[in-house]
């Protein structure tokens, strides 16, 4: 083979550096495997770059240094608002400050409290209606459903649903009826409905398993929507979470000895479905007060039909799990087995109402610590036998009750959450009664 040594670029020629020790201009179209890291200086002409906004192209800024119009359909991890056809839920659990747009209503929300399971979404601009957790305390009305007018109880049952306003001292009004006259029922509350369940009706100890509901925002009769796990009554110990009603401690069956039970059961307050078992109390019991926080139910002051008849423990159980209740603390007194009262709840304390011959006690205990209750005042009338308990944002209420035959009461008492002291009589029920289901809205 002949090798031509020359500074002329051509086929079969050996390249000789020019007078500046540089390779003369040559065609590099066949060069391969050339690393881009070898280029450290100089510029690349725009014409040599395959630019555009389609697949495989290099994106080039326009004359105003802006990215040209292109599709962002496949972009990920880009911060921005959530767009949905519905409002955010309290268990969305975003980061604080997250923005949510309801593209159906046009409402815009910002998460201002990211507490897990209890988010608060604040409506912006001209929009109305924040999204926030439901709280047990009502702001409008207290309800009393059913009850008995006198002894013997079983021939004097009521089906009346009474309602009284928290904002005034007016008497209650009749707003509807239960599907059947009954007493010794349990009351529960939700954002839209109040509930009455269990108890017994005319004709002896005819225990029921009905769960009835009635609308908070209207005046209408109750409807039978579901069943408890078994027939039961003699419980005023109802508690309510944002989604469920809880019933703790009852007497069972339609035949003696009507034993107290340890069962805690729950039913949905947002859909119509039968109750399910939710665990056990620490101590089997019936009668007593029911109290609620956002996360736990409490029972206070109980009765038994065997020694010891008088039980002063406060029990606590979790809404989120079906573990056995804890013996949390004690009330100031252990009263007779027919002293059961409906309880009240502020956001920080439970209020238990106790009565009997010569006894009229209001106990207060903290939800946050295992501290025994303190006696903070008296009811306006000493009474017992299953009064209705209610809670507003500022007051607890105790209504109805019994002081011995034939003295069934119609009194509605109010107890301040802000200042310890005696209850004030603020109105009357439409019918004097005892052992009714209390609720609030």
Model feature map: region roles:
Residues 139, 155-160, 172, 182, ...:
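A detector of repeated loop/turn-to-beta-strand junctions in beta-rich toroidal repeat architectures
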Residues 159-167, 209-217, 262-270, 312-320, ...:
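Beta-propeller blade signature
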């Amino acid at each position: 083979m002949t090798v031509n040594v020359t500074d002329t670029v051509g086929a079969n020629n050996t390249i000789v550096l020019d007078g500046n020790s540089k390779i003369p201009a040559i065609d590099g179209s066949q060069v391969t495997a050339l690393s881009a890291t070898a280029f450290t200086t100089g510029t690349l002409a725009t014409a040599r770059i395959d630019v555009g906004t389609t697949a495989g192209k290099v994106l080039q800024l326009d004359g105003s240094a802006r990215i040209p119009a292109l599709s962002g359909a496949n972009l990920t991890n880009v911060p921005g608002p959530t767009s949905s056809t519905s409002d955010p839920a309290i268990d969305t659990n975003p980061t604080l400050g997250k923005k949510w747009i309801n593209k159906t209503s046009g409402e815009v929300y910002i998460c201002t409290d990211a507490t897990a399971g209890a988010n608060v979404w604040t409506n912006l601009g001209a929009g109305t209606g924040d999204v926030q957790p439901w709280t047990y305390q009502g702001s409008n009305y207290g309800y009393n459903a059913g009850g008995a007018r006198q002894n013997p109880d079983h021939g004097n049952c009521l089906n009346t649903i009474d309602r009284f306003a928290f904002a005034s001292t007016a008497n209650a009004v009749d707003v509807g009826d239960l599907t059947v006259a009954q007493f010794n029922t349990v009351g529960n509350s939700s954002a839209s409905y109040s509930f009455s369940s269990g108890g017994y009706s005319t004709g002896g100890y005819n225990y029921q398993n009905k769960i009835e509901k009635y609308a908070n925002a209207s005046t209408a009769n109750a409807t039978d929507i579901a069943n408890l796990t078994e027939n039961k009554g003699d419980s005023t110990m109802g508690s309510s979470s944002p989604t469920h009603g809880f019933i703790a401690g009852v007497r069972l069956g339609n035949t003696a000895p009507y034993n107290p039970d340890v069962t805690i059961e729950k039913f949905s307050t947002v859909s119509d479905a039968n109750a399910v078992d939710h665990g056990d109390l620490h101590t089997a019991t019936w009668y007593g007060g029911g109290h609620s926080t956002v996360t736990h139910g409490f029972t206070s002051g109980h009765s038994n039909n065997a020694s010891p008849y008088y039980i002063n423990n406060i029990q606590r159980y979790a809404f989120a799990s079906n573990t056995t209740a804890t013996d949390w603390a004690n009330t100031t007194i252990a009263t007779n087995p027919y002293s059961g009262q409906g309880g009240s709840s502020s956001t920080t304390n439970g209020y238990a109402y106790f009565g009997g011959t010569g006894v009229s006690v209001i106990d207060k205990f903290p939800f946050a610590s295992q501290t025994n209750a303190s006696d903070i005042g008296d009811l306006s009338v000493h009474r017992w036998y299953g009064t209705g308990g209610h809670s507003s944002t500022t007051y607890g209420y105790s209504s109805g009750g019994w002081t011995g035959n034939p003295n069934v009461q119609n009194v509605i008492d109010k107890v301040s959450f802000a200042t310890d002291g005696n209850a004030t009589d603020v109105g009357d029920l439409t019918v004097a009664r005892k052992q009714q289901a209390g609720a609030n809205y």
